[in-house]
Amino acid sequence: MGEKLSMDYNENVSRLNEVLNLDTNFDIIRKGITIAGREACIYFIDGFLEEAIMEKLLEFFYKLKPEELPKTAQQMADHVVPYVEVSVMIDEDDILKNLLSGVTCLLLSGYDACIGLDCRSYPMRSVSEPSKDKALRGSKDGFVETLVFNTALIRRRIRSPKLSMEHMTAGRTSQTDIVLCYMENRVDRRLLRELKGRINAIKLDSLTMNQESLAECIYERKWINPFPKFKFTERPDAASAAILEGNIVVLVDNSPQAMIIPTSVFDIVEEADDYYFPPVTGSYLRLTRFLIALITLLLTPTFLLLFQNPEWVPEWLAFIQIKEA
C-alpha cells in the first residue's frame, strides 16, 4: 500500500507530479481547471482518452456552483458526477495503477481522495474471424487485444449470473490484467484455488509474451508428461463451450487468445467445427484425428527402424521389405 492522499491539494499535486515525472513523460497530460471556485486538475494518458466524453464532463464541471459541491469525494462521485464508470481512490498506488491503465484522475481542492473517470478508449482492431482458427460453420468473430471486449464476447454467449469473471494482475512493473472466466456451479474449486495461488505467486517483473509467459510460470516443465497442459483458442464460441464444460478460461490483456485449463489430448485434436456437428459425429472425428496422430507418431519411426535393420523383421511382416528387382 502506498501513501494516502491528504487534505492539502497542493501537496497531493506535487507528489503526483514528482512520481509521474511529467517533465520527461510527454504522453502523461496534466490540465488545471476550476470547479465551483475550487482548484482542480485532471491527469490522463494521451491516446487513451475518449475526448467526446471528457468534453461533456468538463462542460458539466464548469457549470457547477459552490453550494452544489458535497463534503466528500465519495458523495461527489455518487451523486454529482453525471457518469457511470466513476471510482474513488485514496491510495497513491491505486491512483498510479489506474492512471497508467488509461483512467482519467481528478484531484479537487478540499477532498482527500481522487475521483477516477473511466473515459479510456484503447487503440484496437475490429472484431473479425481468426485467421488461424477458422470454421466453416458458426460465428465469424474472434478475440482481440482489448481485454474488456473479449469478456463481452463471452458474456454475450453465456447470459448467466453463475458466470464469474475474476480480475487479477501479474508482473511487478507491467501490472498485466488477467481475467479468470468460469461457471460458479461447475468449476473444480480445488483447481481454481491452485491456479489463483500460482498466479499470485508469480514474481516476474513483467509478462512480456502474455499467455506464453503466464503459462511458463503456472506450469513447471516435466519430462515425465510431455503432453500440453493447456489449450489456446482465438474463438469466443470455443472458449464459451469450454467454460460451460466446467473448464477455466484465462484471458490476458493485449492477447487475442484464450487459455483453456485443464485440457486433454482429445481437446488438443478437436477443431471449432466439431461443436457444430452432432455429438456422435464430433466424437468420431476427434477419435479419428487422435488415432491418425498416434499412428503417425508410432508407425513411421517403427517402419524406418525395421527398414534399417531387416534382420529384426519377422517372417509374417516380410512383405514390407523393399526387394531389389
Summary of predicted features, one role per range:
Residues 1-293, 315, 319-322:
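Membrane-embedded alpha-helical signal segments
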